[in-house]
Amino acid sequence: MMDMKENDQKRNDMMDMKSHDERKNLNSSQGKNEITFPKVLDPKKDNNGYKSYTLKAQKGKTEFYKGNFSNTLGYNGNLLGPTLKLKKGDKVKIKLVNNLDENTTFHWHGLEIDGKVDGGPSQVIKPGKEKTIKFEVKQEAATLWYHPHPSPNTAKQVYNGLSGLLYIEDDKKNNYPSNYGKNDLPIIIQDKTFVSKKLNYTKTKDEDGTQGDTVLVNGKVDPKLTTKEGKIRLRLLNGSNARDLNLKLSNNQSFEYIASEGGHLEKTKKLKEINLAPSARKEIVIDLSKMKEEKVNLVDNDETVILPIINKEKSTNKDTTPKVDKKIKLEGMDDNVTINGKKFDPNRIDFTQKVNRKETWEIENVKDKMSGMKHPFHIHGTQFKVLSVDGKKPSEDMRGKKDVISLEPGQKAKIEVVFKNTGTYMFHCHILEHEDNGMMGQIKVTK
């Protein structure tokens, strides 16, 4: 049996062999398969005024490559899930059914609801069981999503297909495209690795965040988008386990950045590039009528084609942030990841905060001797405001309400955090393997 010194030496050797934040090469989409869009799940109205839904987590088969079927997971289907459309003021009731052969939860990422129905790892639904949750929508229009959060199997279940979008809409009039599936388009970007053209998380898992070599959009490999629309609104979700995305258009055309994770910006921005951390959402509007070309590519890091878009019609900065109330230190890699030097313990409350109290949190990605790696930090049950990064005002695409912030090694950010509901909420690194390995804590919000 390997003794402790040998085991430590083996780990050190492995650490020396790879960079902390190494990006696995991602192959460009060849534009062979037209993407489709998740169906909208229509609610039933009950006698008490609730919009009533049923979501089933289930096993399925998906033909990513012709003639090759992979074992996948989905909500109400083989892969991914339907889109839920809600409005502020809606009373919502959702029956959650676990048809898997393992525990799962249903987490409402970005939704400001009572901690008892947030769907964190303590709210397990066992195989063959179900439960019904109720809540009232109390936040403004935003693009959110839902996914499982069972500890320690979040990464595996998301990778195998459990993800879906949740829109909060309003009746405010604006000029943004709003025809779902026509010019208002949900875009779920993921990266996966296929073994013999089949999905196999076990063989490709990486404790520092599983990155694939194949891009998928809305569950399609080699995706493309063909449209006749002059303007299109892309609701972008980085649904990857660990990969950061730096997105721009291949023709260097600017687009309108209209919404962050928490909803519409007070003032839209003209940008040429945006960053999407794992789990992040951003909404952009692209004016295709300004294109000279028939095709433009949505690309990552200037080169990797994520989604070819075919236009069919053409064939001073000072840190003036307030006093810090809470400090969060993100440290480590592999399975040696911690928050404030501690692994996740479901029986431990790390922080408390009063409901509706405005606090300033300082989030630091601690740089280690090997320089460290990027960590996307997420808080359940709230949308926060980025006050500063390294003492300076946040970049344009970090403005607006957010629920995830990605920090480079050595970076330090201050965020303004307010909880509108009571309950126990999670905060964690949204590299899913890090989350499963204990890079997670709990905050209890009280009256």
From Swiss-Prot:
Its EC number is 1.-.-.-. It is an enzyme of class 1 (oxidoreductase). The keyword Secreted does not apply. Keywords: Copper, Cytoplasm, Metal-binding, Oxidoreductase. One of its GO terms (cellular component) is cytoplasm. Residues 1-43 are annotated as: Disordered. Binds 4 Cu cations per monomer. Cu cation 1 binds at residues 107, 378. PANTHER family: BILIRUBIN OXIDASE (PTHR48267:SF1), CUPREDOXIN SUPERFAMILY PROTEIN (PTHR48267). May be involved in copper homeostasis and oxidative stress response. Belongs to the multicopper oxidase family. This is Multicopper oxidase mco. The lineage of its organism: Bacteria, Bacillati, Bacillota, Bacilli, Bacillales. The gene is mco.
